[in-house]
């Protein structure tokens, strides 16, 4: 089929055109092809080598461009290119999968066994050539993994960056294919860095450079610093690409907030974000242990309190003057470190702080520190991702900007990305422990609880990212590509690339990255799991899909945990985060009533009414609330009446002080399968079939630790519905 035949079906009137515009449309598309097409230098070299060796060389293409236009396109890519034959499928009414190879052999009078064909389509080029006795060579445009990534990235681009043309990336994916082709055979971790992380961080480096240029001007001396630990990879890429002086500044939220305190409030704010904390950790953080604080911890089991409880009690436990004095000492040590680490610190007028993101807490704390010490250096944030509404309270002389800002993706999407960003942090992080203090300009670090194999994996991924950064510019020049020329285009595609990894991972990426642990490093040395698919399953059973999508950490990689459950659940999570999951479709609706048997410890029994709900995915949910004073020992669920045959996804338990607290509790416990008892029901793995109309699932009730317990049952019905 020729291009003219295709455009004959174009809806001309819809766009205010007539059939007379057909040729104009054809030429417009051909002009775009000429502008966007690039020659593959490796393939061109092989082509010319074969030509110089005296072989007959030419082209066979499945295309709607006729041989005349195909010739123009080839010579536009490489002026002076010559060939011995040129076949376009539209000229012959057949493609490589059917008769085009036969036409070529017949017209050229060539023995198929002496012919050699190179192509990038396994069906048309490879199988088509073999069918005619021609020796084929497969030359894929991209690996199967990279091609799959590109498909997912395009889907996410269209979902998350609505309104922008998904086909125009200024050569970003072409560049990734070319760089990847030159680094085949490396480890999976290296390839992840090369094809995913490297392109994102290289584009971010261009953004950081532009931020520095924006700050420059007469009378200004701009210095660039990367915030440790998450800015470690960005700093390495900076050194690889530019060699210009920049600082790697080891400072974190905890140190900066304490050092910025001139009242109790910054410490209260910090502790309020800590999940759990004990007395030794508190002493490490603030360097003092007043008797009242020690007594406070002594009142908790194992001496461990929540950060929220400590923050609420702290004003009555410590003299504010002690905190102010503590902060002043830390400021002195921090400034000594900054002067030693940042070239020309005292002559600097503007300090650009580069980091993954997100709300500029360290930048704001440094502003307070500089103000307290009379330092007039302006501070400018350059963040990979930004929570832009958090920057409204910046000092007037300071600024902050995110590469992936709310102008690139919506705040809904941004918060979904940041909810899953712990994976990126672990990959980009340095191998050192987090800073806890300074001494004589040197860094004093926490212990690093991450295992050696995790550090080695991160190092291999970083090596791949550095390899991309080191070769991308040269390859881009060779092929006349400029993927980072327009910041908003680069930012959108980097958002899609990053979202694909964080939000829609492949199975092999889950296997590679799933064992990673997150170094919480805020009041604890504990490592939090990145993945926990059973957690997600239990949340869906007990609380529903929307509640599972908004679950607090851990697990740190919630999207990956959904992916571990199933790819479809993973995509539902992404739709929810993009605000594209209608609750009236996917949430629960009443299916009907059912009578549940409740058996007391004293032998008494009663039937209680309960409601069966149906989810948007066709699963059935039953929730049974119990109070402690009911003294229930066993629950009998009439599965024969709910669904005579089905898949039991699980039984879960939540507890709380009242029904609302229990229902909203994220502390969901799965009841072990071996504890469940089936009466009149055949059971095989997760599948069951009721043998009688009275078939029941018996759930032994665990000892209650709070006033209310809610047992939830999740079933996918199979076969005929109950009468």
Identify the residue ranges that each predicted region occupies.
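Extracellular beta-strand ligand-recognition surfaces/modules
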Residues: 622-646
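A metal-dependent, Asp-based hydrolase signature
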Residues: 1-28
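Long, low-complexity, Lys/Arg-enriched
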Residues: 108, 112, 116, 127, ...
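Conserved Lys-Pro-Asp/Glu-containing loop-to-beta segment of HAD-superfamily phosphomonoesterases
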Residues: 96-123
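Substrate-recognition element of Asp-dependent hydrolases with the DxDx(T/V) motif
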Residues: 22-75, 85-90, 225
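Extended hydrophobic/aromatic segments used for targeting, binding, or gating
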Residues: 68-102, 257-260, 387-396
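A generic "structured core" feature
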Residues: 17-18, 34-40, 68, 77-78, ...
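Exposed low-complexity, polar/acidic, P/S/T/G-rich flexible segments that act as propeptides
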Residues: 643-661, 694-721
